[in-house]
Amino acid sequence: MATLERLLDLLREYHLDDVLFHNSTPELGIQHRSRPKQKRIIRGKKQQKSKKLKRNEQQQPFPKGDLETLRRFSVTDVKISKQSTKWAKKMADKHLEIIRKHCKTNSIKLFNHFEYTGSFYEHLKTIDADELDIMVALSIKMDELEVEQVTPGYAGLKLRDTPSNRNKYNDLTIADNYGRYLSPEKVSRWFFSLVQKAVNTYKDEIPQTEVKLTDNGPATTLVITYREGDKPQEKNRRLSIDLVPALLFKDKTKPAGDDLRAWHYVAKTIPKGARLKEPLPFRSELLWRQSFSLKEKHLMDKLDKDDNGCRREMVRIVKTIVKKDPTLAQLSSYHIKTAFLQYNFSDVKLDWEGKKLAERFLHFLEFLRDRVKDKTLNNYFITDLNLLDDLNDSNIDNIANRLDKIIQNETERAKIFTTQRQ
């Protein structure tokens, strides 16, 4: 009898008693296991399986459509706190107002005003509010210059040969056989000197604040270090402000809203090593780059307002990934913004509802990868200006392969999204 009871215990342990004794067997003193108990056993198996799936999901936390992972990454690694944004704006406004007044007083014929552009003012800045971009609008008028379009995106700005112009801007121009051209380098040096004098007048008057000025190519960079603060996170904070001279022209013969009505040029020349389709028939150091910063800001201002979409959040996530990845970091913020403009403002209607963030994210990465593979990412406003001409073929191939790996491989994506902000 003991042997029989041992056998029954073994059958129950391996859940075989229902198979052998599917009917009651009173002669052996065996009662058939009740159905509710059997259901509890089956439910227990499902729970074990569910836990196993969850463990697998934790190992691969970004399957397609995983909105939660993107949202979490956006909060922990991408978004800038309101306090940080408020601090940067307050600090910038304080210093820029002093500089603006000095420039207005000491260079009334040349300095006009500041234009607040770039990712901070487009609400596309990520990680930290530590860099700002300002266009310095000069007072030179369009009817004083002849714009000579030399290559897509770049132009020479020649002073018109008129009696009123003959003694103007002598310190800012370079003469050649064709006339006098406004020099980006000379204009940048002039503005640096003007701002340096402004900074010297007040840098020792603001307590707990160190102000330095650096010559960063075409930009005059104001570096503000705040040594003390009411809050721990404010101590030793740095804010870098790039100030770039610009000419903002309006062709009044064109109707309002016409893309050709506004012509903006900044004191930035062609990058060294840029691949050009044809040799320049012009001295490259005299070229000014055409700018669309104000138009881009206008487009970005409208984002997500009508449909409460996730466009800005998606762009910020991509920018953060690109910035942190050694291979992708060869792409500039402007590359990402240009690709987004093409992607968002195409003829294809996209669903930007918040719950579609993960779908839009992967789809945009595919769009960017395809542009890079084709080695063609044209300026949104100048379709024959390829922004990838600044990169060599080897780097472009590496970027394309890296994007492809992130898109196709969930493990690679997991590595990106588990990296926390330092």
Curated annotation (Swiss-Prot):
Localization per Swiss-Prot or TrEMBL: Cytoplasm, Cytosol
Compositional bias per record (Basic residues), positions renumbered to this chain: 32-54
Gene3D superfamilies per the UniProt record, alphabetical: 1.10.1410.40, 3.30.460.90
UniProt region (Disordered), positions on chain: 29-64
InterPro entries given in the database record: Mab-21-like_nuc_Trfase, Mab-21_HhH/H2TH-like, MAB21L/cGLR
GO cellular component: cytosol
Main localization of the protein described in the UniProt heading: cytoplasm
Protein's name in the database: Cyclic GMP-AMP synthase
Origin species: Nematostella vectensis
